[in-house]
């Protein structure tokens, strides 16, 4: 069970939140504990960081959870209701490090601060408790601090809404990254729900509790685990959704934002409301919600996404993934944009080719590209700095990040101004040029070179930016010199060379002269008006002046006033920056776009990639293709070069469907690598990247499916074979004539004849029904005879050489079928005992002899093709005629029925079924 949703009702000996909120608990609590209980009751699903002096303390179940997650000591603090109070704490100065660990573990944290001075509390009574309140709700999807965020990954909060209308419910997703302001919406369907969620990779998914507990969707949320956080269904009310979004953006209508479905509005409204709740009504600088069409991106199902290791390997590491192999970006924004593009490849050839044009332009100008990348290297993460400033969490270094980013943008704009650019890069250049130059000039004139982390430390406004601030700093830092100057002035004015300005705790600053020299200050009207007598000593007299008194006050208040001026300047600069939020975000996206294009251009040159031809045809012709990840790994290891192989799944002349290659060959021959590399080349091409091939022509793929590798799902009671069949079923049910399917070893997890039969039928289905482009690797050599009847099916094999009883894997793909799998040779290489290998050879010889007496080629004549078998089954069903229930259903018109009539009809149908 998700511990986030169950934080208020954990079992065990520790008092729960409901126990603490009881009358008995409140009546027996100390004033401090009563305050804690009240605040905790308002935040039951969060760990409460309760500020006490220099520590954040946690009590009761929160302490138990936090001590376990953080690996810190669990101690005790007195008793409550007859039970000891578990307690642990973390120092305030190190709180971010502990928050990072808790957020990474999926916890939500409410940060409770002291909101008044202890002296103020004492005015209400000697036993009054200092007021405390929650100033921040920290959740995995709503963090903005650099320490808690990965610079190269987006940090999405996602909302899932479901609207029941008609026979099928409507689903929609809204996702927000408050650290960058991205806000997007998309409709989805139950069948692709998990795939769409995993494509976005949210850190936190909020959804109605009614949806969370829907048994039909349980498998989805089991996969997501603690990422899914149920919320009250009222948060997703579509009736009030448009009004809530309009209020957030301060507009009267959303018509200017575009057209959205009810489900999309419900999801967007829930996301916005959750952001406001967690930010305590502060509003991050969110962009206008952008609507994504499901058809605009390549559909990649969850199993395929995992098997192809796009962003992470199966072990969860970024190293070894496709993303890691392609990433040559210089900025955090560029790294995030590349990851987003790779996870959501396009299906529109025009947009794909715009991206490819940008890479080609930069690849053709290597020196220019190097200069652009050098300038990009100096661009900080402007969107995240902007978000912190908008939320009131920013510091001087965030202003500095905006300043440095705008400087880098100006340098890049100058580089691009006279260059030959693609349409995409021209648009990016224009967005950069639209940055307000006066804002950069103001930042340059205001900010110091060295900036502190916290604004309360001061020192971030440069000298000369404010005359009053310079004066206050001079008084604060150079008070002795100022006093000495004033003393010299008074000496000259009075002619008393022994005049001194001194200081004590009683009089403060004062002028002291000997009694014999005081005449010029006491005997004339001008002297008495100028010098005010303060004290007479035995041998001296002390005076002050209005000027000295004012100077004393200024010196005493100079530090406070200097900081106040800096804070006022900071707030003014923040307002100016936030007012230009849209221009800054547009420029930041432009910089990221340039960074991605330049990085992929460098990659193409470095790895000898080529520009693919991408269009709306059904072509899939790869000449000299390579696996991008494996090839780079071999180069790093200084091993043998990667063996390139072609692949042509284009429709044969006159045929409408795509071609299928049936790939046979030995274990360790490279079948799986070949399958994966072609899928990755398709993804790279539709991402808008050059590809590892000598040439490539790809008609856009709408859906990509793979069934590669073996794994079980013990938690859900699924064997390896069951998982294989579920994934294969999804492919056969969803693949279209524009899809690309790669299947590896279908049917290997069961008895030989069962597996062969399933693989046989699957190949026929792909050819006759799906009509997709496909690669089908198998050790069932009997399947190769299908090429005689299936016109778009071709046999291909991984080539090997035998030498003195050893097998040499050439890793080359060629036409034809393998006559054996060389499994025994691989077993010998793996170190199986010689006796086992010898026995295996004997058994294999007998089995092969038996197989020659009943060759598989006879099956092709004995078995009808897939479509024939399907037609027979359909004919058998048709001959029986429709049932009474089917006839009754056809006669019903739900739109013309009252609720009562519909209920009566339902009972009648149920009764008819019971009588059968």
Curated annotation (Swiss-Prot):
One of its GO terms (molecular function) is ATP-dependent DNA damage sensor activity. Keywords: ATP-binding, DNA damage, DNA repair, DNA-binding, Nucleotide-binding. GO terms for biological process: mismatch repair. ATP binds at residues 665-672. It comes from the Bacteria. GO terms for cellular component: cytosol. PANTHER family: DNA MISMATCH REPAIR PROTEIN MSH1, MITOCHONDRIAL, DNA MISMATCH REPAIR PROTEIN MUTS FAMILY MEMBER. This protein is involved in the repair of mismatches in DNA. It is possible that it carries out the mismatch recognition step. This protein has a weak ATPase activity. Belongs to the DNA mismatch repair MutS family. NCBIfam families: mutS1, PRK05399.1. This is DNA mismatch repair protein MutS. It comes from Rhizobium meliloti (strain 1021) (Ensifer meliloti).
């Amino acid at each position: 069970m998700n511990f986030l949703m169950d934080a208020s009702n954990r079992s065990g000996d520790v008092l729960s939140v409901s126990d603490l909120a009881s009358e008995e608990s409140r009546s027996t609590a100390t004033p401090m504990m009563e305050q804690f209980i009240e605040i905790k009751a308002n935040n039951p699903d969060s760990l409460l960081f309760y500020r006490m002096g220099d520590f954040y303390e946690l009590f009761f179940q929160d302490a138990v959870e936090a001590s376990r997650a953080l690996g810190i000591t669990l101690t005790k603090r007195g008793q409550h209701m007859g039970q000891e109070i578990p307690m642990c704490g973390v120092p305030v100065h190190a709180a971010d490090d502990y928050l990072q660990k808790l957020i990474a573990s999926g916890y939500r944290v409410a940060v409770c601060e002291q909101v008044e001075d202890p002296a103020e509390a004492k005015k209400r009574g000697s036993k009054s408790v200092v007021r405390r309140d929650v100033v921040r709700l920290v959740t995995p999807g709503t963090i903005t601090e650099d320490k808690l965020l990965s610079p190269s990954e987006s940090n999405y909060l996602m909302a899932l809404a479901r609207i029941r209308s008609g026979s099928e419910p409507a689903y929609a997703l809204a996702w927000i990254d408050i650290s960058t302001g991205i806000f997007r919406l998309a409709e989805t369907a139950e069948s692709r729900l998990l795939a769409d969620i995993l494509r976005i990779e949210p850190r936190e998914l909020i959804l109605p509790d009614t949806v969370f507990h829907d048994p039909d969707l349980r498998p989805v949320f089991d996969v997501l685990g603690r990422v899914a956080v149920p919320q009250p269904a009222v948060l997703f009310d579509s009736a009030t959704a448009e009004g809530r979004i309009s209020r957030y953006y301060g507009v009267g209508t959303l018509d200017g934002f575009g057209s959205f479905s009810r489900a999309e509005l419900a999801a967007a409204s829930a996301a916005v409301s959750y952001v406001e709740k967690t930010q305590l009504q502060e509003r991050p600088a969110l962009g206008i919600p952008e609507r994504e069409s499901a058809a605009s991106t390549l559909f990649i199902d969850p199993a395929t996404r995992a098997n192809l290791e796009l962003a992470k390997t199966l072990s969860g590491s970024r190293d070894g993934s496709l993303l890691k192999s392609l990433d040559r970006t210089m900025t955090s924004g560029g790294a995030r944009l590349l990851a987003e593009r790779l996870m959501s490849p396009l299906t529109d050839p025009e947009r794909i080719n715009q991206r490819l044009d940008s890479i080609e332009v930069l690849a053709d100008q290597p020196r220019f590209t190097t200069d652009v990348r050098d300038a990009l290297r100096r661009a900080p993460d402007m969107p995240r700095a902007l978000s912190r400033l908008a939320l009131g969490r920013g510091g001087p270094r965030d202003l500095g990040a905006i300043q440095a980013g705008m400087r880098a943008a100006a340098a890049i704009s100058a580089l691009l101004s006279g260059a030959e650019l693609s349409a995409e890069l021209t648009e990016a250049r224009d967005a950069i040029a639209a940055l307000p130059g006066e804002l950069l000039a103001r930042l340059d004139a205001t900010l110091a070179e060295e900036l502190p982390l916290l604004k309360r430390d001061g020192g971030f406004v440069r000298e000369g930016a404010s005359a009053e601030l310079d004066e206050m700093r001079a008084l604060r830092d150079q008070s002795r010199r100022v006093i000495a100057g004033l003393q010299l002035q008074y000496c000259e004015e009075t002619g008393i060379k022994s005049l001194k300005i001194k200081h004590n705790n009683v009089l403060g600053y004062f002028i002291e002269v000997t009694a014999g020299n005081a005449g010029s200050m006491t005997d004339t009207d001008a002297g008495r008006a100028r010098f005010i007598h303060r004290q007479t000593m035995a041998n001296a007299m002390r005076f002050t002046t209005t000027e000295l008194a004012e100077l004393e006050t200024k010196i005493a208040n100079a530090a406070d006033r200097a900081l106040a001026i800096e804070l006022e300047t900071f707030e003014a600069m923040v307002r100016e920056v936030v007012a230009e939020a849209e221009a800054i975000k547009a420029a930041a996206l432009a910089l990221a776009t340039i960074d991605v294009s330049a990085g992929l251009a460098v990659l193409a040159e470095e790895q000898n990639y080529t520009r693919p031809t991408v269009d709306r045809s059904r072509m899939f012709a790869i000449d000299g293709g390579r696996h991008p990840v494996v090839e780079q790994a071999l180069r790093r290891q200084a091993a043998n070069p990667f063996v390139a192989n072609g692949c042509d799944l284009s429709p044969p002349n006159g045929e409408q469907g795509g071609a299928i290659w049936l790939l046979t060959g030995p274990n360790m021959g490279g079948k799986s690598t070949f399958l994966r590399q072609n899928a990755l080349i398709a993804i790279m091409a539709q991402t808008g990247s050059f590809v590892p091939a000598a040439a490539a022509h790809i008609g856009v793929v709408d859906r990509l499916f793979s069934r590669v590798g073996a794994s079980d799902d013990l938690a859900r009671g699924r064997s390896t074979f069951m998982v294989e069949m579920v994934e294969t079923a999804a492919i056969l049910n969803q693949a279209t004539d524009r899809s690309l399917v790669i299947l590896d070893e279908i049917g290997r997890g069961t008895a030989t004849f069962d597996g062969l039969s399933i693989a046989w039928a699957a190949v026929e289905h792909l050819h006759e029904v799906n009509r997709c482009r496909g690669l089908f690797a198998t050790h069932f050599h009997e399947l190769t005879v299908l090429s005689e009847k299936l016109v778009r099916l071709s046999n291909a094999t991984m080539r090997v050489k035998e030498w003195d009883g050893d097998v040499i894997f050439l890793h080359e793909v060629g036409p034809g079928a393998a006559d054996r799998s060389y499994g025994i040779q691989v077993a010998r290489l793996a170190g199986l005992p010689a006796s086992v290998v010898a026995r295996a050879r004997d058994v294999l010889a007998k089995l092969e002899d038996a197989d020659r007496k009943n060759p598989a080629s006879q099956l092709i004549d004995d078995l009808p093709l897939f479509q024939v078998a399907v037609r027979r089954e359909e004919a058998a069903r048709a001959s029986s005629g429709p049932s009474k229930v089917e006839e009754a259903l056809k006669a019903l018109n739900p739109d013309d029925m009252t609720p009562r009539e519909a209920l009566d009809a339902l009972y009648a149908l149920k009764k008819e079924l019971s009588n059968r």
